[in-house]
């Protein structure tokens, strides 16, 4: 996403400082990035007409307060997600309590988050208007636990969810290296056996 790209270009601290100290310059940079992203996404859809979605990663959202996000981020994300596609996917595995209630307004309908916030809490924060993708701890459970631990953690995560609609069970964030086949199979078994 535009905030993440700006942080790659400048450095995270430098970009966040620029937003506070010289907001006009930050907005100019974000406008250039957003225009580029819109052109890039359009080119992809024109080149591959079967593409019916947008997938953006932007963890910088998690380091902003609501007012700053509404000022610097929300208008740009609304522009980017206002495309003629069915799937509007956002990955943000940084803290997401601030952005979660704003996801429907952004146009997001599929969200992959970190594991610090429970799925039940995220359902409430999004008013169950966004399909959630997550959120088993990837490193400490999926990669490091044994198969019994993965099964138990997955079962506990799902048992804590009275409403399992709008949910794609996955790990929070991304798949870590070193996950054993046994752990993947335990995860799948726990999901299949969930009540």
Q: Model regions: which residues?
A:
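Active-site loop segments of alpha/beta catalytic cores
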Residues: 1-195
């Amino acid at each position: 996403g535009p905030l993440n790209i700006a942080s790659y270009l400048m450095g995270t601290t430098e970009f966040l400082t620029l937003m506070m100290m010289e907001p006009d310059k930050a907005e100019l940079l974000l406008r250039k990035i957003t225009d580029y992203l819109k052109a890039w996404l359009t080119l992809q859809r024109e080149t591959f007409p079967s593409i019916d979605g947008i997938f953006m990663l932007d963890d910088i959202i998690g380091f902003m307060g609501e007012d700053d996000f509404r000022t610097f981020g929300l208008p740009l994300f609304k522009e980017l997600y206002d495309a003629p596609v069915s799937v509007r996917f956002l990955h943000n595995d940084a803290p997401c309590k601030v952005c979660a209630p704003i996801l429907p307004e952004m146009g997001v309908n599929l969200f992959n988050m970190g594991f610090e916030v429970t799925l039940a809490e995220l359902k409430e924060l999004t008013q169950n208007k966004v399909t959630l993708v997550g959120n088993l701890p990837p490193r400490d459970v999926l990669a490091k636990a044994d198969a019994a631990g993965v099964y138990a953690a997955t079962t506990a995560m799902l048992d804590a969810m009275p409403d399992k609609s709008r949910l794609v069970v996955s790990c929070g964030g991304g798949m870590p290296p070193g996950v054993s086949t046994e752990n993947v199979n335990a995860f799948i078994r726990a999901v299949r056996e969930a009540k």
